[in-house]
Amino acid sequence: MIKSQKEYLERIEYLNTLSHHYYNLDEPIVSDAVYDELYQELKAYEEKNPSQIQANSPTQKVGATALNQFNKNPHLTRMWSLDDVFNHNELQAWLQRILKAYPSASFVCSPKLDGVSLNLLYQKGKLMKATTRGNGLEGELVTTNAKHVANISHTIPYNEEIEIRGEVIISKEDFNALNEERLNANEPLFANPRNAASGSLRQLDSKITKKRKLQFIPWGVGKHSLNFLSFKECLDFIVSLGFSAIKHLSLNKNHQEIEANYHTLIQERERFFALLDGMVIVVNELNIQKELGYTQKSPKFACAYKFPALEKHTKIVGVINQVGRSGAITPVALLEPVEIAGAIITKATLHNYSEIEKKNIMLNDRVVVIRSGDVIPKIIKPLESYRDGSQCKIIRPKVCPICSHELLCEEIFTYCQNLNCSARLKESLIHFASKDALNIQGLGDKVIEQLFEEKLIFNALDLYALKLEDLMRLDKFKIKKAQNLLDAIQKSKNPPLWRLINALGIEHIGKGASKTLAKYGLYVLEKSEDEFLEMEGFGVEMARSLVNFYASNQEFIQSLFDLLNPKNSDIIEEKQESSSIFSHKTIVLTGTLSKPRQEYAQILENLGAKISSSVSAKTDFLIVGENAGSKLSLAQKHGVNILNEEELLKYLKE
């Protein structure tokens, strides 16, 4: 019990010291229970003596104003993403490119924390803005919530403008405790610590963020006026301002030292306080960083050396069959829950029944499960030595699990051929509204599920007949949300032709193939198999899939095209092409150019060229920038015309 103002001031100082050890040094002096008791006594004293409350009291570090929305906010300097390397050879190649030009370069290595990147802007020593990475140029403004992250300083002993960047995470221990609380409260569990950190930082009610025990680990700076010579000095300076130091950070001179630290970190991975997915490698010398520069997306002076996929053993307790938009049946194993890289895995794909037979996977088998890239659960193999007689064969179904239509069993895949199967229709609509198709904002999986359950839609055409009163029947839909969705659906009309083709969800036809098809105009889907085969990059499977899809859905396609009226600006214009050297030519771009490759690709496509991603004997021109790599060697082998950027610009001016 605090009895005097002197004891009150001493308690503030003591609690701030405890917080520093817990969040910054990761060396807690007392248990959480003891801290909470001391904190509550402080709070009780302040309630009785409000005139004595100090600004540096732990109870006053943040406000608790609920947010109505997150505004977009630009970063003063771009927040880049890192290129990944996945093995010894890729790392060696990355290092050689740097060390060949800069033999004296050294490298700072540190754990790659799997959290949410955050940019803190300080001006005159005060935290002014906290912004998520977003698209790298701008993110969401979460300043109020960031002030609830215990080891984000509200003030720093540095008056110049500076952006301090780092990762917002939740420790494995706090994550498990949070999920335990949610389980007891019958609330949905977070899938992994990163999701928990992201969801906690973006709460509309900042009081919830405060309860989540988020931490901030700095890994760099954005805009600044520091005069340091090395990246390591920058990190040390950030720590001197009161921020947490990065554990297991090291300075390395060569490939051998980097690999040694990488393997040490892998050994520490399970014991590390937070979730890791790799090791970040950054050139230490800032002058070399400046000279190396950036690609369109990433710095050339840094990379993320990803960890190998983790594997665990568990048991298959059941199998369910999912139906995709093409009608393909995908068997999914139901597993005894197992934790891999911080996520509880209860399902894993079995891909198809041919693979089940090939791997001899049985029900009740103990199996090896991995999360490839720490994301996608897969079953690698059964552990046959564990079989005890309870195992039984996984039977290939004969009818669709959704519509009971007889299935077509091919050598590898099994298909539901019923075009009106509700599962196929739902998956088709989810794809139709997806980012690389018509990109209908607000029309996600759950909304489409509801629309089907309410029998409001059966295909894409029905979307455009929806009314406000229809959407008001859906769960959690009010007038504003319903109107926003209707507006988004109407906005999807008049799409680029390639988007509409991609939205159809034709088997074997993705985004790239859709763009190629769009060049041939609005009636491209009416072409014959032979005509499709003449197109760059189209094989027999793709051609037959297009012909069969159009034959089965001709009336639907025509109605959809009439309703949406796609733009046909991608059609090749013969007059425009005729005067260009690039007309009707197949062109590949490689290496680093002064402009983004996509910008040059668009210019060349407008002149009638066909842009390809791979070099072959059919390639007419290879446009090369710096670090052209294997495509240059292949082009020389095939006798392809090779142009550098200067020569390309010369031809474009003609």
Curated annotation (Swiss-Prot):
CDD domains: BRCT_DNA_ligase_like (cd17748), LIGANc (cd00114). Transmembrane segments: none annotated. Residues 577-654 form the BRCT domain. Keywords: DNA damage, DNA repair, DNA replication, Ligase, Magnesium, Manganese, Metal-binding, NAD, Zinc. It comes from the Bacteria. Its EC number is 6.5.1.2. It catalyses: NAD(+) + (deoxyribonucleotide)n-3'-hydroxyl + 5'-phospho-(deoxyribonucleotide)m = (deoxyribonucleotide)n+m + AMP + beta-nicotinamide D-nucleotide. NAD(+) binds at D32, A33, V34, Y35, D36, S81, L82, R133, E167, K306. The active site is at K112 (n6-amp-lysine intermediate). Belongs to the NAD-dependent DNA ligase family. LigA subfamily. This is DNA ligase. It comes from Helicobacter acinonychis (strain Sheeba). The lineage of its organism: Bacteria, Pseudomonadati, Campylobacterota, Epsilonproteobacteria, Campylobacterales. The gene is ligA.
